Amino acid sequence: MEGGGRRVFSNYDLQQVTSSSTTIQENMNFLVPFEETNVLTFFSSSSSSSLSSPSFPIHNSSSTTTTHAPLGFSNNLQGGGPLGSKVVNDDQENFGGGTNNDAHSNSWWRSNSGSGDMKNKVKIRRKLREPRFCFQTKSDVDVLDDGYKWRKYGQKVVKNSLHPRSYYRCTHNNCRVKKRVERLSEDCRMVITTYEGRHNHIPSDDSTSPDHDCLSSF
């Protein structure tokens, strides 16, 4: 009903508006405590563990109790979960790899030690050479008659000398005696004869050289 530019509401309309507002308020009163309860539950759990990670409610189907499980790796580490087992497996793998590396290093060391032993044996053989005897004689002939038969097997040029160095080996069976003949660089008339080893046989009987007795005495 309208009059003088004003709108007049009937009692029915006011009652309907009041009832609708009451219904909205009741609905809000019903919803607000539910939301406040959830918010309070969240903050209470987070405030109780200030140093740990945030937690969320976990509902059990068999009971109405609510438990809060923190998010993170603490459960796995404490309970021996998959992370803890992985750490143990990694340690075991590292230990196994170390064992394989040790075996490989031991085999490498043994091979090197074996080669080192061979080198040492060669050095010992070189040190255990036959004794040497050196004679210096004034002669026009390079090869002196010493009562043994020799075969020339090598020759080498000597530095600062006009005469080469000759190498001879005894022709007797199973005799390993060698000799080296060269002339002195300061005096070409002097012949230097160096013997290596000892003869295991007697000299020849057809030797007529005057130096036979001297050279065959060794």
Curated annotation (Swiss-Prot):
Pfam families: WRKY (PF03106)
Region (Disordered): 49-120, 199-218
Compositional bias per record (Polar residues), positions renumbered to this chain: 64-77
Gene Ontology MF: a single term: sequence-specific DNA binding
GO cellular component term of the entry, any: nucleus
Domain of life where this protein originates: Eukaryota
Cross-referenced SMART domains: WRKY
Keywords assigned: DNA-binding, Nucleus, Transcription, Transcription regulation
DNA-binding span(s): 139-204
GO biological process, one term: plant-type cell wall biogenesis
Compositional bias ranges of the Low complexity kind: 49-63, 105-116
Location(s) in or outside the cell: Nucleus
Function: Transcription factor. Interacts specifically with the W box (5'-(T)TGAC[CT]-3'), a frequently occurring elicitor-responsive cis-acting element.
PANTHER family: WRKY TRANSCRIPTION FACTOR 12-RELATED (PTHR31221:SF137), WRKY TRANSCRIPTION FACTOR PROTEIN 1-RELATED (PTHR31221)
Family according to the record: Belongs to the WRKY group II-c family.
Protein name listed in UniProt: Probable WRKY transcription factor 12
Organism encoding this protein: Arabidopsis thaliana (Mouse-ear cress)
